[in-house]
Amino acid sequence: MIQSLRKILAVAVLAVPFAANATIFQFTASLNGVNENPGSANQGFGSASLKYFDQGTASLADDRFAFVLSAISLGGVATAYHIHGAASFAENAPVRIALDAAPFVTLTNAGGTLVVIGNNVVAPVLIAATPVTGVNAGHPAMSFLQMLQSGLAYVNVHTTAQPGGAIRGQLIQVAAIVPEPEAYGMMLVGLALMGVVVRRRKQT
């Protein structure tokens, strides 16, 4: 069942309408307790994938992103999960995007397993300059895409036992893609699958 869900999510995460001149930037994160600052004793681990759709327009407000987070062996229910920034591996930073609230959908959060998806999410235009704790004194204001491309965004999952953070992973860029025309058909398939997943969740 988990494998089937992952296959559905792999396609559904692409279900974001984009312009012909759009560029897709892909970021991934590996989450574990060692990455927490300070470290966490939580034995869980997970992965996250974020696809940022740069629409190629003058306004960053037109940009969208899709997101998938999955984690297992958390030792209990996740109490909160967010994207934080701007911060390097050795730093902590404020919450920038709440993954446990709309428009994100939590498909599973039980028995130490967490699965979250977000589709066609409006990308934040500006990440305000905020002092962070850690090695550096702080980072200047920047766009969400700049924060991602600088490796200064991280995913953090919290539990009752580790309210400050159970597992964490830095989002790292792995690809930049200009979609070919045939990719638009894949977008339609992704949209259909996303609808199926959400409907099944509502029925359970």
Residue ranges of model-derived segments:
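Bacterial N-terminal signal peptides that target proteins for export
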Residues: 1-9
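A short, hydrophobic C-terminal helix/tail in secreted or cell-surface proteins
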Residues: 179-199
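Short, charged juxtamembrane terminal tails flanking transmembrane helices
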Residues: 201-204
